[in-house]
């Protein structure tokens, strides 16, 4: 599901779950093990990438179906809390986490990308939070990260208008640090990883800690409000109908 390759102080983690690399418990488990390994090796940089056409297409449809069952509100809240914990751990680890993003980074997949310290996107990447279309909200404190990184106006475009944007526009809005074309993305990302890894490990750890320390309290408050909103939405008929319609469309695609 995730292969590992170490290059001196760089740990390269390549996701290979399915074409969309959708998130379920097994992928979260694998990502947590990767973070454990980065801690064990005291890696300076964790380079997260995909061998599939897409970085991460969001929640797995099997998990979404689970949210519509009789105890679905509890299941959704549990999934959201677990994803939030994973994303917060990515922020908290002293290792610099760098996402190389090609293809889709949607919903929780965008949340995963935004939790990383550094991002490089291909020009053809597709970025968005389509959850509102089906009566939900993006999980894992994604709304706050999106607003912090791109500003309120851009966040409104993605969240309220439901815009799906390409990598070039995401880069213009401040959601990626670097932009590359599809053919050179892997090479360009490797070069950035090597450049970062040459920095002082001690200075990088302290720089990361200071960058995130100021907003930690407000992030915790937002996570609580987010969980309350999920519970309300998944218990309401209109969002449930939209989710059901989405699952039917996905099933019909084969």
Language-model regions, residue ranges each:
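Short strand->helix junction
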Residues: 20-21, 54, 136, 178
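Terminal peptide-recognition signature
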Residues: 13, 31, 48, 60, ...
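A general structural signal for well-ordered alpha-helical segments in protein cores
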Residues: 28, 48, 61, 83, ...
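Residue-level signal for tight coil/turn positions that link beta-strands
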Residues: 7-8, 52, 94, 183
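Conserved CoA-thioester-binding segment of acyl-CoA-metabolizing enzymes
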Residues: 1-51, 88
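Glycine- (often His-adjacent) and acidic-residue-rich active-site loop
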Residues: 50-86, 105
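Crotonase-fold acyl-CoA enzyme core
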Residues: 88-201
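C-terminal alpha-helix plus adjacent terminal tail
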Residues: 1-8, 38, 162-167, 187, ...
């Amino acid at each position: 599901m995730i292969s590992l390759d170490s290059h001196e102080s760089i740990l390269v983690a390549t996701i290979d779950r399915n074409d969309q690399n959708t998130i379920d418990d097994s992928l979260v488990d694998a990502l947590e093990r990767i973070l454990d390994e980065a801690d064990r090796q005291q890696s300076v940089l964790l380079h997260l990438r995909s061998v599939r056409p897409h970085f991460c297409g969001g929640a797995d449809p099997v998990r979404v179906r689970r949210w519509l069952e009789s105890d679905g509100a509890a299941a959704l809240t549990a999934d959201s809390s677990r994803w939030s914990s994973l994303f917060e751990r990515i922020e908290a680890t002293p290792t610099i986490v760098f996402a190389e993003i090609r293809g889709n980074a949607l919903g929780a997949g965008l949340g995963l990308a935004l939790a990383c310290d550094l991002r490089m996107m291909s020009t053809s990447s597709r970025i968005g939070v389509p959850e509102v279309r089906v009566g939900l909200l993006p999980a894992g404190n994604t709304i706050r990260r999106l607003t912090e990184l791109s500003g309120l106006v851009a966040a409104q475009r993605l969240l309220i208008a439901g815009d799906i944007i390409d990598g070039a526009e995401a880069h213009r809005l401040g959601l990626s640090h670097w932009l590359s074309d599809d053919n050179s993305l892997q090479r360009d990302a490797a070069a950035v990883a090597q450049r970062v890894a040459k920095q002082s490990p001690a200075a990088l750890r302290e720089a990361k800690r200071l960058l995130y320390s100021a907003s930690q309290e407000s992030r915790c408050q937002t996570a609580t409000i987010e969980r309350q909103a999920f519970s309300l939405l998944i218990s309401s008929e209109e969002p449930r109908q939209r989710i059901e319609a989405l699952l039917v469309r996905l099933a019909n695609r084969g």
